[in-house]
A protein has these predicted regions:
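Residue-level detector of functionally pivotal "anchor" positions at catalytic/ligand-binding pockets or at interdomain
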Residues: 166-189
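OB-fold nucleic-acid-binding modules
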Residues: 1-172
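Short, small/polar residue-rich loop motifs at catalytic or cofactor-binding pockets
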Residues: 86-88, 178-181, 195
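C-terminal tail/sorting-segment detector
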Residues: 200-210
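Conserved beta-strand and immediately adjacent loop positions that scaffold enzyme active sites
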Residues: 11, 111, 182-184, 200
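Terminal short linear interaction segments
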Residues: 97, 198-201
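Structural motif
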Residues: 16, 116, 188, 203-204
């Protein structure tokens, strides 16, 4: 189990085999990393397409055993494409080496994204801002571990369960630099010139002396 609280709601996520689900405020204690066995009566509900289980009049802990454990659930190494395909819903995942970006939707308020080429998902720092997402730098590469626990306007959201860490560059910057080095060269009149041309030129959108 992974347990957190959000505005008075107890969010408990459990995994069985390759499937996970949220147990939302069932009314009895299920500590972090505990193992649940038995059965419990609940209602299945959906929040923007994400399933969760919630208490009803018959919910109690009489037929369920909660065994505390120190062994934490291992995150699944996933990709942005996996989440866009709705894999690992409600499960604990790690996404490595994504590029961070943000978009201002209201003055001083931002949506945050993990990008992989043309694809992206949102990062929602829901649980006490443990991920430190607001302090990340646009264009930098990071790793995030969290729950694929929400979908916002059709876009998957990962909810960090620990601080976002620095990733490893995949060499894209070197490819970009090489492309700039090989960019065509123009003089100030807009005529294409060769590397032997002397004077002020425009290359890759920048003026320079050659």
């Amino acid at each position: 189990t992974f347990v957190n609280e959000y505005k008075g709601t107890i969010n408990t996520y459990v995994r069985e085999g390759d499937t996970a689900i949220e147990l939302r405020t069932l009314g009895f204690n299920m500590p972090v990393n505990s193992i649940l066995t038995g059965k419990v009566k609940v209602d299945l509900k959906y929040n923007y397409g994400v399933p969760y289980l919630t208490a009803n009049a018959g919910t109690d802990d009489e037929s369920i055993t909660v065994t505390e454990s120190n062994e934490a659930a291992e995150p699944i190494e996933a990709t942005i494409a996996d989440l866009l395909a709705n894999k690992y819903l409600n499960d604990l995942v790690t996404i490595k080496n994504f590029t961070f970006s943000k978009e201002e939707y209201q003055t001083g308020k931002f949506n945050y994204y993990a990008n992989d080429g043309e694809q992206k998902i949102m990062i929602y720092d829901k649980f006490n801002k443990v991920g430190g997402v607001a302090e990340l730098t646009e264009g930098e590469v990071y790793n995030v571990t969290g729950l694929y626990g929400a979908i916002f306007k059709g876009t998957p959201e990962i909810l960090p369960t620990q601080k976002v860490t620095a990733g490893t560059s995949t060499g894209i910057n070197n490819i970009t630099t090489s492309a700039a080095d090989n960019a065509p060269i123009f003089n100030l009149a807009g005529q294409k010139v060769g590397k032997g041309y002397k004077g002020v030129v425009i290359k890759a959108g920048k003026k320079m002396i050659q």
